[in-house]
Amino acid sequence: NMDMKNIAFFAAALFLFSNMASTVVTAETFTYSGGCFWCTEADTEKLDGVTEVISGFTGGTTASPRYEPGKWGDHREAAQVIYDPDIITYEKLVRHVYATIDYEDGEGQFCDRGRSYSPAIYYKTDSERLIAERLAPKNSVVPIEPESVFYPVREEHQDFYKKRSLKYKYYRFSCGRDSRLDALNGN
């Protein structure tokens, strides 16, 4: 009798587990640099199919960069996008990036200057590289580089646009991000 109960329990658990496994969401990552990560995170989290955006650093050689003057070395501020490819495609994400950065400025973005604020799109596969190259606007100076180690920034900078919305809005406005994007995109 005990063996039959164990078998029944095992069969029920196996059935439940197999049903749960079939509903697991597939997640992919996409990383890009577009100036201040507070802004890139805010612009990208609103997209359907994006489940999370993590602010951080990538694209350099400095080990363990930190958000302190001189401590992020040769890295760029970046956004790592976690998304469901069944809802949003890599191609749509790349189109979004080109629409929300100044793709004509390789020396920084908007009021922020220097390599740490310069734009870049990072790819994992040749297919991703080809998509990013094909979608690049005619005057784009945005480098398309192989993905490298991504270092998340401290928690206080994650979701900054939600946690410190007034400071974020002031920064974004005073930096001229939206007015430049409107001019660049013909709005």
What are these regions (language model features)?
Residues 2-10:
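Bacterial N-terminal signal peptides that target proteins for export
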Residues 24-187:
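Flexible coil/turn and secondary-structure edge motifs
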